[in-house]
Amino acid sequence: MKATSPSRIVLSLALLTVLTGCAFAPEPTVDRSAPAQWTQQPTDRTDRAGEPTPGAKLTVADLQTWWSRWNDAELNALVDQALAQNLDLAQALGRLKQQRLLMGVANAAYQPEVSGGIRTLQDVAAVDSYFHASIDVAWDLGLFGAREASQRTAHAELLNVQASVRAASVALVADVVHRYLDIRMAQYQYGLFAERVALDERTVQLLKVRREQRLDTTEAVHQATLQLTQSRAQFIALKESQTRAAHALAVLLGRSQPDPKWLADGNVQRPSQHPALDLQVLPADLLRTRPDIQTAEAAVERAAGALGLSRSALYPRFALSGSLLFSYNLTQNRRTTADHMPLVGPVIDIPLFDWGRRRSQADADEAALDVAIMGYRQSVLEGIADVETALAGLSAQRKRLDLLQSTQTLIAERDAVLARRQQLGLASEFSRLSEQRAALQNRSEMAVAQGAQALAYVALYKALGGAPLPAELQAAEPPAEGRQP
C-alpha cells in the first residue's frame, strides 16, 4: 500500500481551510453615518442684550448623572432608591445574569463529549446474559463557520439583554424625575389656585354688594360665581394629577404606598430651573448611548449568526466518534474478548436529498440580515430625530417662558398703578381684582411653562440615552462591533 505523501496531506488541509473560510457569512455592513452637529441647539438663556449665554457643558459622561443638575437633594435620593429597588430593573438585571450563565455553554456543542453507560442484556438465543460497560466519545468539529456562527448568535443574545438593561435604566430615571417634577409643580400650583379661589370668592362678595347698591347686575354675580366654580373644579383636577403622580412614583421605587409628603397640599416654592446647557454630545455618540440602537445592533448580530449557521449547513458536517466496550458474560462467569476492541472513526453528514431546503433557509436568513441592517439604520435616524425634536421643544418652551415673563412685567406695572390710585382714593378694591386675577393666571401659566421646560429637559436626556450604567454592565467587557472571518 502506497503511503500518503506529506504534500498531499498539506494540500488536503489547505483545501479544507479554504472551504471552511468560504462558508463564513460575510461581515454585515451597517450605515453608522450621522450628522456632525445638531440642527437645534439648547441656547435657552440670554443676557440683557438678547445674546445667548454659555451654559454648563454636557458630555457623554455627564449623561450618567443628568438629574443632579437640578441641585435637588431629595430628587437625587429618589433616583438612587429607584435604581436600587425598582422591580423592572431588577428583572432586567436577572435576565442579564441568566444570559451570562448561558454564554458559558455557547461552545458546548463543539467540545468533545464523553459519556459512559452500563447495562445488562441477553443474546439473541436468550441463552447467555451479558454485562456491558462502555465509554463513548463524540466531537463535532464545527467546521465551515458553524462554531463561529454559534458564538456570534450567543454574543448577540448577550448584547440584546445588555441593551434591555440599559433601556430599563434610562426609562426608570426619566420616569422618576418626571413624576417628581409633576408632584412639585402640582404642589406649587396648589398655592396659586388657592389664591385664585380666594380672589374669586372676594369678587363674588363685592359684586353682591354692588348689586345691592345697584352698581352691578345679577348677571355679573352669576358670571363671577361660575368663574369661582370653575376655579374650584381646576383645584380638584390638580389634586387628582398630584395623586396619580405620587402613586406612579411609589411604584417606580418599589413601594406599595406613596410618601405622605407627596400628597401634601403644601405651598412649596417653585421648583428650581434647570441650568443652561452647552451640549457636547454629538449625534455619533448616540450609537453607544441609546438602548434602541444597541438593540438593533444585536438584531444584526443575531441575523448574521443565523446566516452563518445556515450557510455552514450547506457543507458536510464532520465529527469524530469513538467507543470502548467492556463485556462480561454473566451466565458463564467470564469476560468476553470479541467486543473489547475500541472503535474510532469519523461521522460525515452530507447534505444530498435536503440540500434544496438548506439552500432556501440560507437565502431566507440572508434576507433577514438585510432587514436587520435596514432596521439598524432606522433606529439611528429615529434617535437623531428624537433628540432634534427634544431640542426644538426646549427652545419653544424657553421662548414661551420669555413671553410670559414680559406679560407678567406689564401686569405688575398696571397693578402698581391701580394700587397707587387706590391709596389715593381714586380707585376701589374691586377695580384691582381683575388685574390681580390676571397676574395670578399669568403666574400659573408661567409655572406650567417652567414645568413643560423641565419635562423637555427630561425628554432630551431620555432621547440621548442618559442613565447611570449599572455595575453589572460596567464590569462587562465592551461588546465587539463585529468579527472578521
Where are the language model's segments positioned?
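Periplasmic alpha-helical coiled-coil/stalk elements that build and connect Gram-negative outer-membrane
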Residues: 147, 163-282, 393, 397, ...
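Small/polar, glycine/serine/threonine/aspartate-rich low-complexity segments that form flexible
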Residues: 55-70, 80, 117-138, 150, ...
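Transmembrane beta-barrel architecture of outer-membrane proteins
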Residues: 75-77, 130-132, 178, 223, ...
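Terminal intrinsically disordered/low-complexity segments used for targeting and assembly
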Residues: 2-81, 155, 239-288, 294, ...
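A glycine-/polar-enriched beta->alpha junction
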Residues: 81-90, 100-112, 136-152, 163-170, ...
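A short glycine-centered flexible hinge/capping loop motif at secondary-structure junctions
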Residues: 211-215, 422-426, 463-467
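Amphipathic alpha-helical coiled-coil segments and their boundaries
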Residues: 85, 92, 140, 147, ...
